[in-house]
């Protein structure tokens, strides 16, 4: 709405941040009554809820297996912080029995459908960009704050741990003047977003004193 409403007045550089809550708040998904009853305080922050009544959430992904480490690993041989974190999560959001594979698969299906929902909303934003006439003059950055353990290594949510599942998130940059299709296998951080955006917008002629590194050279394979 902002893009369409203001497209004729955008005569100087602009930044639009579009933020989607889910799948971040997957911790409030209810896998069943057993999980709900095991919460230490059912009224803490928010109740657990089933998927929204939306066709996109009707898709069942239970034919896809859980992460391989879900069955292979247990918390017994993990560092203390893993077990402590799992206990806190169980207390706040309810316990999910590892033997209840159906509950974990339902949790995974909800997560996948949240991602599909985000894709649908991103399509709306891209369509608004095109309708506003700004699509070919806009740098688009798509990223996330963290991943989801989803049962990997016996954990869920993000956790005080560093695994591929919770630390490897998408960072996709589309630049109208740069050909796409390039994959760069280098580390980046959310701290790098501001200096990278400044570098892209000013073609590297301006820097900032904010933390982080300008990743814009990676667009051309540097």
Walk through the language-model features, giving the residues of each.
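Long, well-ordered early-domain segments
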Residues: 1-2
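Active-site-proximal cap/lid insertion segments
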Residues: 6-12, 20-137, 141-187, 200-207
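C-terminal lobe and pocket-closing loops
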Residues: 209-213
């Amino acid at each position: 709405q902002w893009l369409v409403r203001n497209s004729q007045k955008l005569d100087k550089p602009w930044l639009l941040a579009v933020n989607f809550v889910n799948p971040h708040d997957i911790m409030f998904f209810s896998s069943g009554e057993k999980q709900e009853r095991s919460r230490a305080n059912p009224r803490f922050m928010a109740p657990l809820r089933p998927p929204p009544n939306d066709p996109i959430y009707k898709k069942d992904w239970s034919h896809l297996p859980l992460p391989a480490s879900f069955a292979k690993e247990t918390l017994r041989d993990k560092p203390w912080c893993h077990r402590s974190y799992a206990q806190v999560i169980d207390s706040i959001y309810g316990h999910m029995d590892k033997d209840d594979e159906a509950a974990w698969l339902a949790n995974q299906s909800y997560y996948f459908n949240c991602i599909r929902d985000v894709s649908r909303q991103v399509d709306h934003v891209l369509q608004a960009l095109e309708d506003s006439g700004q699509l070919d003059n806009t740098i688009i950055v798509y990223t996330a704050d963290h991943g989801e353990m989803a049962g990997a290594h016996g954990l869920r949510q993000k956790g005080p741990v560093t695994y591929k599942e919770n630390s490897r998130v998408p960072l996709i940059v589309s630049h109208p003047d740069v050909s796409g299709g390039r994959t760069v296998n280098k580390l980046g951080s959310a701290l790098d977003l501001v200096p990278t955006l400044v570098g892209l917008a000013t073609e590297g002629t301006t820097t900032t004193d904010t933390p982080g590194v300008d990743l814009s050279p990676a667009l051309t394979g540097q």
